[in-house]
Each structure stands twice: as structure tokens, then as C-alpha cells.
Amino acid sequence: AIEGGNGVKVNKIHKADSPNYLFIDVNILKDAAPGTYYFVFSKDGKPEFKYPYEIAARESGSVQRKSYTAADMIYLIMPDRFANGDPSNDSTSDTAEKSDRSKYFGRHGGDIQGIIDHLDYIEDLGATAIWCTPLLEDNEPDGSYHGYACSDYYHIDPRFGSNELYREMVAKAHEKGLKVVMDIVTNHCG
């Protein structure tokens, strides 16, 4: 069941081979009100726990947002290997893998600030869009630099920066007329 309003409907529930996983197909209705909805998980007809599901308010003008065309030149960036604009975030106490430039598959320290610092360079190349490999948290003990084993779909990996710094990067890219692709991999995670 869902609590919090009539804006979200459960279409189907899929049980996985493992009892640790459950997949839920939902339909977010066109008139769904922004807010927090709750999936209510029950056992033997009695509620066991609730899981929050937030629907944010649509940003003004988001429907008119320009898309990408064949005329765009997209510059692909692997942030960890691009530029280190803030060495203080190369290793954090909250993440498993620490920066080690001597390891080929280790983290090398590139970050969002490094991208911001080089937006003029990207613009001068003639790029019209930036596509960063995933910047969301990838808290694997090894090989986490590429970001393709996301462990938190809501937060930028602290070794890259913060959600606020990501928004700043996008705003500064837009000021230069650069579009930004946010790469997110949802079919496998860490």
C-alpha cells in the first residue's frame, strides 16, 4: 500500500529469487502532488515498516528545456581522471577507497571543482555539452573511480564534491551555453 496521497499507484510487485529483494513498478500520475509518499510493507496483513518515496516539485520551465541534437559535440569526462580542483576531498573518512595515484584502477583525485576550473577549456574545444561518467557515490573498496557501481543514488560522491557543487557546475556550464548530461546507471549498483 501507499500512504501520502493519490499521486502514486503500484502497478506490479516482483519478487526476486533472493528474499532480500523486491521490485515495485509504480505509476506517478500527472497530477501527483509534490511531497513524501510511503510504501507500506506488510506481513500477514499487518504493517511491518514504511519506506519514504519523495516526489519533488517540477522546476518552472523544465518542460521547455532544450535537448541534445546531432549538431551537439559532447565532451565525455571521467571526472576522477580529468582535473583535481580540490585535493582536500581526494580521500574521505566516509568512503572505503582512498586516493592512490600509483594504482592504475585506483582513485586519482579528479573532481567537480576540477571540471568547473576547466569549463573555458571545454568551451574553447568547441564542445556544446559535457557528459560526465557517474558522479553519484560509489563506495566500493576498489576501482570506484569510474562511478559505475553506485551505492547512493541521492548524493554526489564526496570525493567529487557535493550536490551543491554539482548544481554550481551545471549552472556555470549553462552560463557558457554548455549542456550537461548526468550519467546514472540504475541496472547495477554497489
Predicted feature descriptions by range:
Residues 1-45:
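Immunoglobulin-like IPT/TIG beta-sandwich domains and homologous Ig-like subdomains
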Residues 185:
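A short, small-residue-rich loop immediately preceding and capping a beta-strand
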Residues 45-159, 163-178, 188-189:
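N-terminal structural segment of carbohydrate-active enzymes
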